[in-house]
Each structure stands twice: as C-alpha cells, then as structure tokens.
Amino acid sequence: MSKSNSMNSTSHETLFQQLVLGLDRMPLMDVHWLIYVAFGAWLCSYVIHVLSSSSTVKVPVVGYRSVFEPTWLLRLRFVWEGGSIIGQGYNKFKDSIFQVRKLGTDIVIIPPNYIDEVRKLSQDKTRSVEPFINDFAGQYTRGMVFLQSDLQNRVIQQRLTPKLVSLTKVMKEELDYALTKEMPDMKNDEWVEVDISSIMVRLISRISARVFLGPEHCRNQEWLTTTAEYSESLFITGFILRVVPHILRPFIAPLLPSYRTLLRNVSSGRRVIGDIIRSQQGDGNEDILSWMRDAATGEEKQIDNIAQRMLILSLASIHTTAMTMTHAMYDLCACPEYIEPLRDEVKSVVGASGWDKTALNRFHKLDSFLKESQRFNPVFLLTFNRIYHQSMTLSDGTNIPSGTRIAVPSHAMLQDSAHVPGPTPPTEFDGFRYSKIRSDSNYAQKYLFSMTDSSNMAFGYGKYACPGRFYASNEMKLTLAILLLQFEFKLPDGKGRPRNITIDSDMIPDPRARLCVRKRSLRDE
C-alpha cells in the first residue's frame, strides 16, 4: 500500500484550534485578555510592517499573490501557508537562491548545491542556535543561555553519545515502568481509543528524565510536570511575542498568562535541579545533569545556568521526538501491512540475544520505517538554520549581508527524486525504502535514520547537525519496538491517516486525532 503527498496536506482551519489546545486550561478571563493583547500587538506589528522595508538581499521573494499584496499580509499568511510557500519556491527555483517572509524575519533559502559552501564557515561568522532563540523570543523565554556557550552540546557529544549502547537496558527499564503508568487499563481483546500524541509525550518524558536525572530523581513529579508545562508556555509566549515589535515586548510579555506560567516553570525547574545538585555526593553518576555539572566552567556552573539548559534540552528532546513518534504511529496504522514485518524483526533480534547493547542497531526495517516517516512528516520544514554575523559573497556573486538568516528547504528536497534514493517514486511511502538499500554494504551507514548528508537534512547537516540525533534515534526505535511487542494499534473505523497541521515552518501531527489500541495476548505470538 502506498501513500501520496496527501499525507502532508495541512489543516489551515485548525491553526487557531491548535493554539487553543494550549490556552484552554487558562481561566476564561485570562484567555480573553490574552486575545485582546495579542490583537493589539498585531495591530502595532501591522503598522510597522506596512511602513518598514524588507530584506536587503537581492534574491527573488516567493509567496506574494499579486504585486498589490502588502508584505504584512504575506508574513501573516506564512503562519498557515508556510509549507506551500516554501514548496512553491523550491519547485520554481530549485537550484537558485530565493527568500520567504515570515513573522519577524525574512529567510534566505539556499538550494542543495550551496550547502557545502556555506557549512564550512567558521562559528564566528554564523550561529545555528540563534534562529531558534529568535523564533521563541529567547530574551523572555530564557533561551539566551544557549548563546553564552555550548556546554549542552559538549555534554551530548562527549558524554551521552559514547554511552548510548550501555543505556539501552536503562532506557528499556524506564519505558517498561512508563507503560504501566501511561497506557490505559485494557482487558484482553478490548480496543480502547487513546490520545497517542499525549501518550508519546509522557512516555518520552519519562525515558528522557531517566537519562537526564538518573534513577534516584527521574520520577520526580514536579520535574515531569514542569518540563511538560514549560514547552507549552514557551511555545505560546514565543508565538505571540513573534508578532510584537521588539520595543513593545517588555510591556506586553508580563501581561501574557503563558509568560507568567513560564516564569513559574523556570522557578520550579531551578528548584528541582538545585536540590539534586546539592544532594549529589562525589562523581560517578551516569546522567546528563551530572555530566553537565562536571563539564561546566565559570558561569556555566551556576545553578540557574544549568537549570535553564536542562529545561531547554528537555523541551528539544521530548517534544520533537514525541511528534516524530506520533507521525510514525499514524503512518503505521495507515499502512498496517508494515506491522507484522516490523514485529517479526523485533522478535527475531530480541529472541536471538535479548535486549543486549547492540539490539537496536539490528532493527534495520524499524530504522528504515522511521526514516521514511520522517521524510514525509518532518517536524521542521526548514533546517540548517543560520544567522550570519559577517557579510559574505557566495560563489555566484550573491551578497549575504550581516544579520541575514538562511535555511535549507529540507522537506521540499525530500519530495524530489534527485534527493530520494531507491526505485520507489518519492511521492509514494515505502517504509522499507532505506533498509533495502542498506542491504548493500556500501550503503549500510549512509542511510541510517540518524545519519545526515546534503540530500537528507532532517536532522541538519555538518558540524551543527542535531547533536542528540543518535540518542533520539535509539529512543524512538526502542519505544516503537516495545509497543509492537506489547500492543496492537489501528485507526478508528472509517478514519484515514490524520492530517498534519502546518504552523509557520513546523509540521505537527494532529493532536486531536485518536488511535485504537489493545493488549497483545500470548496467542498472538
């Protein structure tokens, strides 16, 4: 069974509903007040956009409906039409540079043939984390700590990644526990409708907490609640402040209920991390917090500094992973012919040697299915995000002024036969596309889920590719494998694969969709 690009169709009318999922827990008066404030800020932003000039980069702009459409309207439309605007630009220009206009900034989109040229720039000329900080108003959402140093990257690359093979057993133990807490009670043969999106967030949160905080503190309910709330409050606060002129943000931010919640989350996170650090005695703890404490120097050693890094790392590790897993579950239920081959592979590997250190590396089909699902449904439509801090001229003569933001249209590239391997057309979903290619030893490493190159940049590319992608890959393969062994999944009767929601340049699995689940019994073996 194959699926076309309709998998990626967006639900424009649900944009506001998506935001409301985060707002509906607030008191009614607070929600109304937030809407009034956001509307007033948008009016201010409207005036500024109408009167101000745009990017000085001399490359084509895509997305305008006509020469009469004002820039402020194009920026606003990008919120719900970002995917189609980027795709339109890629299909039209493909091997040439173009730009898109979104709320708060213009982004210069570079094609694949420029990637190797720009990725070699030194760190003093370009920053990869700054676009994320800007998108989520880092000065107010406490993201500026990531601009001060790369402590978190050093810890992930030098301590976490080398330990991954030894963490398989630890992660499985926590996942087994998490399933007893987060999956609903089910009788044999009883199908139960579940909110798989929320379940994935909670499962990944618990596994991540075990790796982040160690066995003694990973089930701290205050930390689990804080990390869940922090991501929600950061997203809402950042999204609203993105449309507010910088000069007004100091006055608008304190009025936002989500911002006040965020401050409470930061305070709670600081308290939990501070208590753990003060209670730790000596060295030898094998968790990210301990590694970060040991690797920190100077101001990095401050509890506030470490706590904020831990919160942002939790956000990145939990929610992008949970969304990728939710996409994969939707794809699995939409293409149920993959379920038994994947389950058989897991049973074969585990039956031969148990959950040993190399078990996850032998899940070739599972790895391929996750990579193909991500190809169709990446969380980020644009990757390789950079902001230049020094003017430069590319080989074709294009001048990139200081302060310019660039990105690569990685999702559009992965719908192009020039960048998708195998005989199956890129418009068709082939869950075993990559495992078939990897059967040739020459490509055994190249097409792993966690690997990146200039054709597949879902995790970024080069020295600034996502440092946690190897951990995330293992976490997802482990979670999907255990779910396949213990449960059956299907779409509700009469339902197709849930449509994705595109907000700005992010692709989100529909959080309102449901799947049906039941326990597997011994006779299923």
Swiss-Prot record:
Main location: membrane
Ranges that cross the membrane: 31-51
Cofactor dependence: heme
EC id: 1.14.14.86
Tagged with keyword Ubl conjugation: no
Family membership noted in the UniProt record: Belongs to the cytochrome P450 family.
Name of protein: Ent-kaurene oxidase
Source species of the chain: Fusarium fujikuroi (Bakanae and foot rot disease fungus)
Chain's gene name: CYP503A1
